[in-house]
Amino acid sequence: MFTCEAGIASVQQAIKDVAEGKFVIVIDAASRENEGDLILAGEKVSTEKMSFLLSHTTGIVCASLSREQAKSLDLPAMVQDNQCAFKTAFTVSVDASSGVTTGVSASDRTRTVQLLADPAATAESFVRPGHVFPLISQPGGAVQRPGHTEAAMDLMRLAGMQPCGIFAELVNPDHSMMRQQQVLAFAEQHDLTVITVDDLITYRYTYDSLVTKISSARLPTKYGDFSIHVYESIIDGTQHFALVKGDIHEQEAVPVRVHSECLTGDILGSCRCDCGAQLDMAMRYIAEEGLGVIVYLRGQEGRGIGFGHKIRAYALQDLGYDTVDANLQLGFPIDAREYGMAAQVLKDLQLTSVRLITHNPRKFFELQRLGIHVLDRIILPVSISTENEGYLRTKKERMGHWLDLPVLDDVEEEYETVERMSCR
């Protein structure tokens, strides 16, 4: 069932507030800046609102713009070699070219922001440098880059505003950065809506259309005929696909496998993992049921770290690291995969509810969080060998996977029907 009503409701309220010219607060991840920013629609700015912004923040007023806007206003990158930890895309700073004095006062910066939000403004409307800092938003918004720049732009678009949101980082009276509890107290004091960047990303995966179906065909396989549907992400152009068996339109309790790309396991028959066996068993199960879907997510090699890094992790595993510590040693999360595109594909297929073929609790609950009605899970046998036993036990013991692993000596007797048992 859907499990993030509070976050979704907060985003809906934030969108309403932005449209009404109110400030909202957006908090990013603790692993990122871990800060709260006041955000306001540029076209709704006033001297009074600018004064409030300057009084409670660092005073560095940023304005999110699209790449096209920056180009039309002749706003090049501030530096050619961006060494910022989060690659924040600053352009040269600006002031309005008329109607201001020094450019730094609340009224002067209000005038500058109003021009940035004005679609009739031109490059000649500004002087450079100045006291307002335009930032270029990634075209995919917060889904592509989970920063305040993109969050501001997403909120402007969702609220029907001009694509220019202003924002600045909240600070305490001693000018230290506000952290989450301080931000929440400030929001309560000033009756402001607070959302997180993750809330906004979830909202977009739930309500936006972020994939486009680009082709479909019949696909005969060793398990019979499937239909294959290719989807392209509008965020980064990655092409994912769905294998469909039977008439699934508005069906309930449809068996679904969400499978992350694994070239070594799915194609090369690697014995280090059970990915290829899981894919085979899911296809067989769905074929026998006569109904089901396999969503194949491209670009998720090595639990999202990429193919080259996955092979580096293999080398570390040969030195004694398990699959978790190998990722950490390379500087990556244990599991960097996201399932938003899977949710998008399932929604496009118009499934009412699903039964998920998985041992992975994170996948199960993440799809629920993204609005997919997951009724229950389907457990298929585990393909275990001397080569992948440690990998599977790490998934069970360190990643919490729902795995009931047999004693290896009993494998062939217990799971004689499971393919890919030749890995010794």
Swiss-Prot record:
Chain residue ranges for the region called DHBP synthase: 1-206
InterPro entries: DHBP_synth_RibB-like_a/b_dom, DHBP_synthase_RibB, GTP_cyclohydro_II, RibA, RibA-like_sf, Riboflavin_synth_RibBA
Cofactor entry: Mg(2+); Mn(2+); Zn(2+)
Pathway annotation: Cofactor biosynthesis; riboflavin biosynthesis; 2-hydroxy-3-oxobutyl phosphate from D-ribulose 5-phosphate: step 1/1; Cofactor biosynthesis; riboflavin biosynthesis; 5-amino-6-(D-ribitylamino)uracil from GTP: step 1/4
GO cellular component, one term: cytosol
Site (Essential for DHBP synthase activity): H131, E169
Annotated residues for binding of D-ribulose 5-phosphate: R32, E33, D37, R145, P146, G147, H148, T149, E169
Gene3D superfamilies listed in its UniProt record: DHBP synthase, GTP cyclohydrolase II
Keyword GTP-binding: yes
List of residues binding GTP: R257, V258, H259, S260, E261, Q278, E301, G302, R303, T323, T358, K363
Catalytic activity: D-ribulose 5-phosphate = (2S)-2-hydroxy-3-oxobutyl phosphate + formate + H(+); GTP + 4 H2O = 2,5-diamino-6-hydroxy-4-(5-phosphoribosylamino)-pyrimidine + formate + 2 phosphate + 3 H(+)
Binding site for Mg(2+) 1: E33
GTP cyclohydrolase II: annotated segments: 207-424
Residues forming coiled coils: none
Binding-site residues, Zn(2+): C262, C273, C275
Protein task: Catalyzes the conversion of D-ribulose 5-phosphate to formate and 3,4-dihydroxy-2-butanone 4-phosphate. Catalyzes the conversion of GTP to 2,5-diamino-6-ribosylamino-4(3H)-pyrimidinone 5'-phosphate (DARP), formate and pyrophosphate.
Homology family: In the N-terminal section; belongs to the DHBP synthase family. In the C-terminal section; belongs to the GTP cyclohydrolase II family.
UniProt name for this protein: Riboflavin biosynthesis protein RibBA
Biological source species: Chlamydia trachomatis serovar D (strain ATCC VR-885 / DSM 19411 / UW-3/Cx)
